[in-house]
C-alpha cells in the first residue's frame, strides 16, 4: 500500500468486503499536512500565515489539498499558482515594471490566501461512494457567493474524481493524485497537484 507515499491512484490495498481502499489516516487534515512537508510545506506555510489552522481540524468536510507542485511548478502546462499570479515591482535602475513569480503564499495579502484556502474545503463528505456521475456544484467554506466547487465521479476503467471541469476554468479535467483518504476527524482528503479557481457568476448562471 502506498497511501502515505501518495504515489499512485491505483496503489491502494483494497478491502473487497467494503469495496473501498484501506484509506484511514489517524490524524487531522492539518496534522497530515504537517507530517508531509516534502509535498505540503507551502500549504502548511499558507495555513499558518492565514491563521486558519482550526479550519483544517473539522469533521464532516472534504479537504482538497494542493501540493507544492500546485503552487510552484515552473512547467508551463502545470499553470501553477505562483506562475499564474505573478507580482510586480519597479526596477530602480530602469524604472520598468518587472513581473516575478513569488516563492511563498506569504507574498500575497493575507485575506487572499485565507479565501484561497477556504475555497479548497468543501462542506460535507464526498468520495467515490457518494459523488454523482454528472458535474455538480458544492458549497465550500469560503465566503464569496461564487465560492463553489464542481465535482463528479468519472466512471471509467480507472474511476476518479474530476474537479472544476467547466468552460473557462484555467485547466480542465483536474484529478487528484491520491484520493479518498479518511482522517481522524471524520473528513475526506484528496491530494492534488493543481489548485482550483472560483467560477464567475456567469459560469454559475447567477444574476
Predicted regions, residues:
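Mature, structured domains of secreted/extracytosolic soluble proteins
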Residues: 1-207
Amino acid at each position: 500500500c502506498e497511501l502515505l507515499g501518495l504515489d499512485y491512484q491505483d496503489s491502494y490495498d483494497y478491502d473487497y468486503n467494503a469495496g473501498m481502499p484501506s484509506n484511514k489516516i489517524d490524524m487531522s487534515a492539518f496534522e497530515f499536512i504537517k507530517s508531509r512537508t516534502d509535498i505540503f510545506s507551502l500549504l502548511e506555510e499558507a495555513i499558518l500565515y492565514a491563521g486558519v489552522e482550526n479550519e483544517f481540524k473539522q469533521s464532516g468536510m472534504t479537504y482538497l489539498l494542493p501540493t507544492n507542485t500546485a503552487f510552484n511548478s515552473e512547467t508551463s502546462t502545470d499553470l501553477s499558482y505562483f506562475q499564474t499570479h505573478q507580482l510586480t515591482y519597479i526596477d530602480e535602475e530602469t524604472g520598468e515594471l518587472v513581473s516575478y513569480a513569488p516563492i511563498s503564499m506569504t507574498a500575497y495579502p493575507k485575506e487572499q490566501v485565507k479565501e484561497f484556502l477556504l475555497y479548497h474545503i468543501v462542506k460535507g463528505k464526498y468520495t467515490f461512494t457518494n459523488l454523482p456521475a454528472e458535474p455538480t456544484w458544492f458549497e465550500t467554506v469560503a465566503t464569496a457567493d461564487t465560492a463553489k466547487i464542481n465535482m463528479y465521479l468519472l466512471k471509467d476503467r480507472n474511476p476518479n474524481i474530476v474537479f472544476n471541469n467547466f468552460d473557462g476554468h484555467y485547466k480542465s479535467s483536474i484529478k487528484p493524485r491520491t484520493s479518498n483518504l479518511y482522517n481522524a476527524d471524520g473528513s475526506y482528503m484528496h491530494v492534488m497537484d493543481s489548485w482550483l479557481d472560483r467560477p464567475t457568476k456567469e459560469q454559475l448562471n447567477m444574476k
